[in-house]
């Protein structure tokens, strides 16, 4: 089952059209500050956006809000 979460798009740590690049960015960020909350790589649920974004997992919201976009979690880091 897909895990759907909501984030404010402006809070992204990194964005990329390539999953590998998003993963690399997340790993670099994690190495620099390993005490921060876990990270997630997500993909927007709407079909027109085909990129990946990296967010702090603790910032995820399970409820929709006008200023938030729905994402499907691709990987927890």
Where are these regions (language model features)?
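A short, charged, amphipathic alpha-helix used as a generic interaction element across diverse proteins
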Residues: 15-37
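Short aromatic-glycine-(Arg/Gly/Cys) micro-motifs in beta-strand/loop hairpins
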Residues: 1-12, 37, 41-77
